[in-house]
Amino acid sequence: MDLPPDAGAHTAFPLLGMTLSEFARQKLPANAPMPGGGHDHGESVPIPTAQAHRDFIAVVSESLANECQEPRQMVRMVDITFESSPVGVSTWTVPEASGNFCGRGGRFGSHSSNENFTSIYYGRVLFVTFFNAGVRALDVRDPFNIKEIGYYIPATTANTDRRCVGEGASQNCKVAIQSNNVEVDDRGYVYVVDRANTGLHILELTGAARKVANFGP
């Protein structure tokens, strides 16, 4: 798939032109590469320049194995201000002990983020699915310090499929939520689809988490 550099897709979400006061007085050395083009602080910006505006991409790894039988998959934030020299700056994952997720059944770990660039959430809140840990709302205003500000784990229903580990007589199966994909719309509603046949959940951000978003007056 051929995508422009400012487009996200499923497991990669660009956060371009993020204003970080920490870098307001940072200068570039004369031999530094040019920042990436195509956006508001790209090729037209002279060198040296203050680097308060930086570009990032949220890379969301996908869990594939049930009950933690693989390396932990998580959200990784990468600084791509200089596209030829990407730098990882932070990671985030749901703490396993917060819900005994390795023992709940099914997959545990990240899968995908929202893809809509609505101004309500862009550069502020990123939603990421974590299979049996539901969907997580992350404050990404400071990509160096990602913070969770909300989450929702749907309840299983009679329609929720089992997820198994092992084979034959040693096979063990459990019914588990598997929040698979998440998307938002331009009104701010959040849509979460379950991989284990539980269905679609429509959510609304509330409380302190809603104040991080940009719903306007």
Regions found by a protein language model. Name each.
Residues 1-217:
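Feature marking well-ordered beta-strand scaffolds used for ligand recognition
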